[in-house]
Every structure is written in structure tokens, then in C-alpha cells.
Curated annotation (Swiss-Prot):
The keyword DNA-binding does not apply. It is found in: Secreted. Constitutively expressed in the adult anterior midgut; proventriculus, thoracic and reservoir regions. The modification Threonine amide is found at T66. Its main location: secreted. This is Stomoxyn. Residues 1-24 form the signal peptide.
Length: 67
């Protein structure tokens, strides 16, 4: 997993350094948008998992109380 992370960082650095300033600026802007989307998706997934755990816990408590 770490290998892929380093590979992505290396590719991004090479692309930014090899491109002209205008292209690099546009690429960085696009890349930052992509990173924000990924972070948002991870955050939403964590919230859904937490909500699911709360619902499952509540259901287990109800079953234990009635059972």
C-alpha cells in the first residue's frame, strides 16, 4: 500500500515539474479538487458506518430488553 502512495506522489511531482507553470497550476487545482472529493467520500463513509453501528446497537438493546 505504501508503495502505491509513494508512486502517486512521485508521478504528481514529475508531472508538476515537467509541465509549464500555467499547466502545473491548472493540474494542481484539479488535483486538489480530487483530493477534497476523496476526503469527503471517506468522511461520509465513516459517518454512515457510525450511524449503522448506532442503529445496530439500538436494535440489539431492544432485542435484549424484550427477549
Amino acid at each position: 500500500m505504501n508503495f502505491y502512495k509513494y508512486l502517486v506522489v512521485l508521478v504528481v511531482l514529475v508531472l508538476c515539474l515537467s509541465a509549464t507553470q500555467t499547466e502545473a497550476r491548472g493540474f494542481r487545482k484539479h488535483f486538489n479538487k480530487l483530493v477534497k472529493k476523496v476526503k469527503h467520500t471517506i468522511s461520509e463513509t465513516a459517518h454512515v458506518a457510525k450511524d449503522t453501528a448506532v442503529i445496530a446497537g439500538s436494535g440489539a438493546a431492544v432485542v435484549a430488553a424484550t427477549g
